From Swiss-Prot:
GO molecular function: ribosomal large subunit binding
Disulfide linkage: none
Cited Gene3D superfamilies: 3.30.1360.40, Ribosome-recycling factor
Biological classification of the source: Bacteria, Pseudomonadati, Pseudomonadota, Gammaproteobacteria, Vibrionales
Protein name (database record): Ribosome-recycling factor
The species this protein was found in: Vibrio campbellii (strain ATCC BAA-1116)
One GO cellular component term noted in the UniProt record for this chain: cytosol
Gene responsible for this protein: frr
Length: 185
C-alpha cells in the first residue's frame, strides 16, 4: 500500500518535471531550434494540423529555421500561421522552402523571458508540493484506518519528502540551465 502511494507520487512528480522541460523548450532563446515552432498549427483540409505533420522543420544555422512544406499549396498558410503566432517571427518564402530568421533578443526581452521561465518553474514546484500533500493525506487515511502504524507513516512521509526534494532539485537544475541559455548573448 505504501509502495503504491510512493510509486504514484514518484510518477506524478516525474511528469511535472517533464512537463516543465517541454514548456521551457518552447521559450525562444537566441538559438534556432525546431521545437520553437512545435506549438503552431496550420489549417489543412479544414482541420488545424500541427506544423510538423505538414512540413519538415530543421535548424539551418544558429539563427535560421528552414521549413520544407510537403504540399506546395500550404506554403502561404504555413507562413501566415507563423506570422500569426505570438513568437514575433517573420518568415520568408523561397518556393517550397520557408526560411525563418530569428532576430537577436534584446536585453529587456531576455529578462522578461527569464521572469516567464521562473514562473513556469514555480508552477512546477507547486505541483510537486501538491503531489506530496496528496500522498501524505493518503498515508493519513491509511493511518486513520489502522492499516499502517505511526512509525510506518512517519517513515513513508520521510520517503515522500525525499522524492519531493529530488523533484524540486531537478526543477531548479532545468530552470538554471534555461536561464543560462536565455542570458547568453
Amino acid at each position: 500500500m505504501i509502495n503504491e502511494i510512493n510509486k504514484d507520487a514518484q510518477e506524478r512528480m516525474d511528469k511535472s518535471v517533464e512537463a516543465l522541460k517541454n514548456n521551457l523548450s518552447k521559450v525562444r532563446t537566441g538559438r534556432a531550434h525546431p521545437s520553437l515552432l512545435s506549438g503552431i498549427s496550420v489549417e489543412y483540409y479544414g482541420a488545424p494540423t500541427p506544423l510538423n505533420q505538414v512540413a519538415n522543420v530543421v535548424a539551418e544555422d544558429a539563427r535560421t529555421l528552414a521549413i520544407t512544406v510537403f504540399d506546395k499549396e500550404l506554403t502561404q498558410k504555413v507562413e501566415k500561421a507563423i506570422m500569426m503566432s505570438d513568437l514575433g517571427l517573420n518568415p520568408m518564402s523561397a518556393g517550397t522552402i520557408i526560411r525563418v530568421p530569428l532576430p537577436p533578443l534584446t536585453e529587456e526581452r531576455r529578462k522578461d523571458l527569464v521572469k516567464i521561465v521562473r514562473g513556469e518553474a514555480e508552477g512546477s514546484r507547486v505541483a510537486v508540493r501538491n503531489i506530496r500533500r496528496d500522498a501524505n493525506s493518503d498515508l493519513k487515511g491509511l493511518l486513520k484506518d489502522k492499516e499502517i502504524s505511526e512509525d510506518e507513516d512517519r517513515k513513508a512521509q520521510d520517503e515522500i519528502q525525499k522524492l519531493t526534494d529530488v523533484a524540486v532539485k531537478k526543477i531548479d537544475e532545468v530552470l538554471a540551465a534555461k536561464e543560462k541559455e536565455l542570458m547568453e548573448v
